[in-house]
């Protein structure tokens, strides 16, 4: 018996470009909008701080820990702390006091993974002051905490109970020598 095999040839044709297709990205626009010549390096036109560099100081890198918001400033007075608490209350944040007896700064002891630090969570002084409307109430609690723990770091935080986030935190008191 004879075997007959048949081969079918298929022809593929390229389809013409569709009229509604978006043109491919061809690069940036021409350089016509940019200046053709480079400016000379004329340093007399650079911005200046008016020679105030001589009176600026560098934060000493040793022996001075940086804590939180406002930590680069000198210790705040009672009046300045009260103004910060007023700001916190104006923003409808709930004031809360926290204190730490041993480590007033973040450190690494229990884990070496990136982003994890010990010392971020301090002991809360009483309960958050929900309904507080006067900075004098917060300052009274601060004085009580200082009286109970004179060698503690004490910070005031502002908590937004709607978004459930801490919005502000600053050191209100540090132990002697810090």
From Swiss-Prot:
It is found in: Plastid, Chloroplast. GO terms for molecular function: ribulose-bisphosphate carboxylase activity. Gene3D superfamilies: Ribulose bisphosphate carboxylase, small subunit. InterPro entries: RuBisCO_ssu, RuBisCO_ssu_dom, RuBisCO_ssu_N, RuBisCO_ssu_sf. One of its GO terms (cellular component) is chloroplast. Signal peptide: none annotated. GO terms for biological process: photorespiration; reductive pentose-phosphate cycle. Keywords: Calvin cycle, Carbon dioxide fixation, Chloroplast, Photorespiration, Photosynthesis, Plastid, Transit peptide. SMART domains: RuBisCO_small. Residues 1-54 form a transit peptide. Its main location: plastid. Pfam families: RbcS (PF12338), RuBisCO_small (PF00101). RuBisCO catalyzes two reactions: the carboxylation of D-ribulose 1,5-bisphosphate, the primary event in carbon dioxide fixation, as well as the oxidative fragmentation of the pentose substrate. Both reactions occur simultaneously and in competition at the same active site. Although the small subunit is not catalytic it is essential for maximal activity. Belongs to the RuBisCO small chain family. The basic functional RuBisCO is composed of a large chain homodimer in a 'head-to-tail' conformation. In form I RuBisCO this homodimer is arranged in a barrel-like tetramer with the small subunits forming a tetrameric 'cap' on each end of the 'barrel'. HAMAP family: RuBisCO_S_bact. Heterohexadecamer of 8 large and 8 small subunits. This is Ribulose bisphosphate carboxylase small subunit, chloroplastic 4. It comes from Flaveria pringlei. The lineage of its organism: Eukaryota, Viridiplantae, Streptophyta, Embryophyta, Tracheophyta. The gene is RBCS4.
């Amino acid at each position: 018996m004879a075997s007959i095999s048949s081969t079918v040839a298929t022809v593929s044709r390229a389809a013409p470009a569709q009229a509604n297709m978006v043109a491919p990205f061809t690069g940036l626009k021409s350089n016509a909008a940019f200046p053709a010549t480079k400016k000379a390096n004329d340093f007399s036109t650079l911005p200046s701080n008016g020679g105030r560099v001589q009176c600026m100081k560098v934060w000493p890198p040793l022996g001075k820990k940086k804590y939180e918001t406002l930590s680069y400033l000198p210790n705040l007075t009672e009046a300045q702390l009260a103004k910060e608490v007023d700001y916190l209350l104006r923003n409808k944040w709930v004031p809360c006091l926290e204190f730490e007896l041993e480590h007033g700064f973040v450190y690494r002891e229990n884990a070496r993974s990136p982003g994890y630090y010990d010392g971020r969570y301090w002991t809360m002084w009483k309960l958050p002051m929900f309904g507080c409307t006067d900075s004098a109430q917060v300052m009274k609690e601060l004085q009580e905490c200082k009286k109970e723990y004179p060698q503690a770091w004490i910070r005031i935080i502002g908590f937004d109970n709607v978004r459930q986030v801490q919005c502000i935190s600053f050191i209100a008191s540090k132990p002697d020598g810090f």
